[in-house]
Amino acid sequence: MNWKNIKHGTELKVKMNKIYYSWKQVEGACLDIARQINNSDWRPDYIVGITRGGLVPAVLLSQYLDVPMKSLDVSLRDGGDTVSNCGMAEDAYGFNPSADGEPVCKNILVVDDINDQGSTIAWIKQDWQSLCLPNDERWNFVWSYNVRFATLTNNLASKEFVDYSVWEVHRQNGW
């Protein structure tokens, strides 16, 4: 395919067993996720976009929700490169207490394009928890309240749960 000949707004079809969405579809999906978040009792303090596929949706959600955005390099499928981020783990856990000694937990929305088999979400949970008091039971609260996950597409057969998504698939063997 000659990418130079593709005009803006062209909807791309399935290629090599992948589904490509148009820019308009991605914008609409991100607006839908922003509405889901606005209709919930939860609001992120910041958004984390997972490289590569989560960066565009994270930027759009950051703009729609007026919330800062950071990125996290987790490329399990594309060569296994991952970068830990102790600061994000500490923010979620509330490792740095306030002046009165109470934990100050930040709400973090982690955004990716797809929750396929759950490997990225599982890696983030394991990594962040291992960086900051890994055996503390408070992590159960952190994962159920402070950190939430959003993807454009959610595989219902995934081992991990996604809080916000737009499209659903059910594939036992992943993409």
Residue ranges and their predicted role:
Residues M1-R43:
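Active-site-facing substrate-recognition patch
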Residues K4-K13, Q126-W175:
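PRPP-dependent phosphoribosyltransferase catalytic core
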Residues R35, V59, Q63, Q126-S130:
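Short, well-ordered alpha-helices that flank and scaffold nucleotide-derived cofactor binding pockets
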Residues D66-L109, D116-D127, R138-F141:
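Short, glycine/charge-rich flexible loops or terminal/linker lids adjacent to PRPP-binding catalytic cores
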